[in-house]
Structures are given as C-alpha cells and as structure tokens.
C-alpha cells in the first residue's frame, strides 16, 4: 500500500512549485534500522540564485526528517568536490546545526562534474541512501550509470532534478 503526499507552494519569485511523495509501507525491521545518508549538492555556476537557495532549503528539510542513530554527510560539487566531514556524522542537534551552517555557506561557481563525487560516495560499498540534487546536463551519463551499476549495488540513489533540462 502506498502513502502519498502532495505539497504546493510558490517560490520567492512567484513561480509555482509542486512536491510529490509516494512512500510504500516498509516492514518494521527495515524502519528501525539505522541508515547512512549522503547528500550530494550541485554548486556549479548554473545553480546560482533561486536553484541553489531552494536546493539548500530542500536538503535542510530532508535532514530534519532523519532519526536519532542515522548518520549523514554532505558532498558539495562543481568541477571538483568537497566533503562536509571526513566521516559520516551521527544525526543530533549539534551536527544538524553544523550541517545547516555548512549548507548555508555554499556558493555557486564552476562546471558540473558528477562522476567523482559519486565515486567517493560509493567508495566503501556499504549500504547508503544517496540524494543527488543537480540541474546538470552531463556528457558522460553512460559512464556514470555504468559505474553506479557496478559499484552501487548496496546503495539507493535518488536524483532530484532542479530544472526541466536535467539529463
């Protein structure tokens, strides 16, 4: 059985925004397990302005939904990438405040290179939930898909397109 939710809102510049969520019921055993979440945030030049500000807001809202015991980290990328922390952080109030401060400090510049942050995210081959926020149109999507197929068997990746031109 699916649980669904729809939220409509206006962006700061008056454009309509729609968020849809469809969640299957999951066994309690899976529900209670601690998870590791990685948030990959595109900070390339094309994300400047409302795209990046709305992405920041969305990531902060996602972080607030984590449970005690969950772990998380944030990877910001343009033509290179940086990691908020050298290791996954346990979700708690202090780390949430640090994450908000880090997210709000991000600035857009550079090109879009998605493969290297994905390689980093999947390096340990442990079970992770990866949320990818990008407006990118990449030329190496086959290489990215092939890498994820080979190395991402234990992880779930959820891409969020921040525009209508994402590939």
Would you name each region that the model predicts?
Residues 1-167:
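Exposed acidic/Ser/Thr-rich ligand/metal-binding surfaces
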């Amino acid at each position: 059985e699916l649980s669904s939710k729809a939220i409509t809102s206006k962006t700061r510049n008056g454009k309509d925004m729609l968020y849809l969520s469809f969640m299957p019921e999951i066994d309690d055993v899976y529900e209670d397990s601690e998870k590791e979440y990685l948030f990959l945030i595109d900070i390339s030049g094309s994300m400047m302005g409302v795209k990046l500000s709305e992405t920041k807001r969305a990531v902060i809202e996602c972080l607030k939904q984590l449970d005690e015991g969950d772990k998380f980290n944030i990877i910001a990328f343009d033509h290179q990438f940086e990691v908020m922390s050298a290791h996954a952080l346990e979700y708690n109030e202090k780390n949430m405040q640090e994450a908000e401060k880090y997210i709000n400090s991000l600035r857009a510049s550079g090109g879009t290179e998605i493969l290297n942050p994905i390689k980093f995210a999947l390096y340990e081959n442990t079970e992770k939930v990866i949320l990818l926020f990008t407006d990118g149109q990449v030329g190496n999507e086959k290489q990215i898909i092939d890498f994820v197929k080979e190395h991402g068997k234990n992880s779930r990746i959820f891409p969020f397109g921040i525009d209508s031109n994402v590939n």
